[in-house]
A protein has these predicted regions:
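Single conserved hydrophobic/aromatic residue that forms the stacking wall/gate
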Residues: 1-13
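N-terminal Lys/Arg-rich, disordered targeting/topogenic segments
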Residues: 12-22
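Primarily the internal scaffold of c-type cytochrome electron-transfer domains
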Residues: 21, 25-29, 38-130, 168-310, ...
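Long, charge-dense tracts
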Residues: 129-153, 185
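Long, mid-chain structured domain cores
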Residues: 137-147, 162-176
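Long, structured ligand/cofactor-binding scaffold of large enzymes
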Residues: 152-155, 162
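Catalytic cores of Mg2+-dependent Asp-rich isoprenoid enzymes
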Residues: 487
Length: 490
């Protein structure tokens, strides 16, 4: 079979049917009495309670009888979690360093013309930076008042354990429709223990209701998930494709018809969903977020029951000091603990195997990017020549389909390794639809009396591409700097 998850029955079979036989003991968190809870309460500037991690100092008062003030400064899990601040690892295509993706791929700014991602798109750092990096992103704008700015509060949904805390006193509809800046003084903790662990037992738990809701709509219950399944589902809470529903901006996962790129596209089409209208081509486009969980399930590791934990949080230490490393990062940074837990080849061979998959996917990704970029530019040219809505209808549909496939593959972290065959298939489909769109545009131009090649702008650098799509980056950066200096606490 193709390995695709295209129906409700496939979803049930995948979730309930396959488990990894681990090569090491799994009774870790509960048996280690040194693993205790993570938080003490502190009062924010608004006077409301907010979670804050105990700092690494000896002058913090600790009440071991109070679950709000239990010390886990010395646990291996907590200490390794703090290492998510490390930014020294770099692999062939990624790592935990903050690279400017737009500078590396100027065409992406044309693909996102009219959308905030054309302003700023950096590779992700560790969980420790989840709040800081959102502050600094040009995509969140420069709101100088709590009720201003371009983004909704829903953009905080996966950035902090403070969101589940706020949802205990405020319903999602009320919370998410607020402005992003309005929750700024409440969101103080980066992604951490409380996002995945129940404080009393340290067992795994769901803290994002939108994943529970998506499961329920497919006739499944999170409560029935096995421990092994939970080791991926806690990650899937945030590492999945999502969208904002309606004016209330309720965050939801589009899994109603399945997990594949076609399933999710069909769902979005059925509700007439669009993230943005392209500034050049006028196509109504969907912006993929990070369909990591979806694509992971379509690769051999996901199909064999391997969880996210085995490769991104491997067991380290020996005997009573054995624990799962909470310095979540690329498996390539610790091949001896990840790949070699199951595979007996050398680190060099295993790394080469990963890079070979990535290079092959990267090659076709660049083909799609080039064709799709030209298609948007040519579509604008056709509009400028007087094309009608009727003439461009099929072009716009093909552009929507092509860009969704490209973005689904590119936005997913680790897709080229998680599911190389499926990602290659998706990109191949995207290339086909991009080419079809360009052919249709040429036909439209011929009808309008134009039979020459469409002139292409110079978008060879980030600055040139942003200038071409009409962005005033100097003004954007100045506004952001003022925001950081006057609004964000130093």
């Amino acid at each position: 079979g193709s390995g695709l998850v295209g129906s409700e029955m496939c979803i049930r079979d995948r979730i309930k049917g396959k488990h990894l036989k681990a090569h090491y003991k799994t009774s870790i968190a509960i048996s280690l009495i040194v693993i205790i809870v993570l938080v003490i309460l502190r009062t924010t500037v608004t006077g409301q309670d907010s979670i804050k991690f105990i700092d690494d100092t000896d002058d913090q008062p600790i009440d071991q009888q109070n679950s709000d003030s239990i010390d886990l400064r010395y646990s291996n899990e907590y200490q390794s979690w703090k290492q998510t601040s490390d930014t020294t690892f770099r692999s062939l295509f990624n790592g935990n360093q903050q690279a400017d993706i737009l500078a590396e791929h100027p065409g992406m700014m044309v693909l996102w013309a009219g959308y905030a991602f054309s302003k700023d798109y950096l590779s992700p750092r560790g969980h420790m930076y989840s709040i800081e990096d959102l502050y600094k992103s040009l995509r969140t704008g420069a709101p100088m008042t709590p009720t201003s700015g371009p983004q909704p509060a829903a953009c905080w949904a996966c950035k902090s354990p403070d969101i589940p805390r706020l949802l205990t006193t405020t319903d999602a509809k009320t919370l998410y429709k607020k402005k992003w800046a309005e929750l700024g003084n409440e969101i103080v903790n980066p992604i951490g223990c409380a996002d995945c662990h129940e404080p009393q037992s340290m067992g795994l738990r769901m803290t994002r209701s939108f994943l529970k809701s998506a499961y329920k709509r497919n006739g499944l219950r999170i409560e029935d998930a096995t421990e092994q399944e939970m080791r991926s589902l806690v990650c899937a809470q945030c590492h999945a494709e999502y969208y904002f529903q309606g004016e209330d901006r309720i965050l939801a996962l589009p899994w109603d018809q399945g997990y594949t790129v076609e399933n999710i596209e069909a769902y979005y089409d059925s509700i007439n969903f669009t993230d943005f209208t392209h500034k050049l081509s006028r196509a109504h486009l969907i912006k993929a977020q990070h369909p990591d969980f979806e694509l992971f399930q379509m690769g051999i590791h996901g199909q064999r029951g391997v969880s996210c934990r085995e490769c991104h949080m491997p067991a380290v230490g020996e005997d009573e000091n054995r624990y799962n490393n909470h310095h979540i990062k690329s498996p390539l940074a610790m091949i001896d603990r990840t790949c070699q837990a199951c595979h007996r080849e050398s680190e060099e061979i295993l790394r080469k195997d990963v890079y070979e998959r990535q290079n092959k996917v990267y090659a076709i990704r660049m083909r799609v990017e080039e064709e799709l970029t030209k298609a948007h530019i040519e579509a604008k040219f056709a509009w400028d020549k007087g094309a009608t809505e009727s003439q461009m209808k099929n072009v716009l549909k093909l552009l929507r389909q092509a860009q969704w496939r490209w973005d689904f593959a590119v936005a997913s972290h680790g897709a080229a390794f998680h599911a190389p065959q499926e990602v290659t298939r998706i990109l191949g489909s995207g290339l086909d639809k991009s080419t079809q769109a360009r052919i249709q545009i040429m036909k439209v131009l011929a009808q309008l009396g134009y039979t020459q090649d469409v002139p292409m702008p110079d978008i060879s650098t980030k600055a040139k591409a942003q200038q071409y799509i009409g962005l005033d980056m100097e003004a954007e950066q100045q506004a952001k700097q003022k925001f950081l200096e006057t609004v964000i606490p130093q």
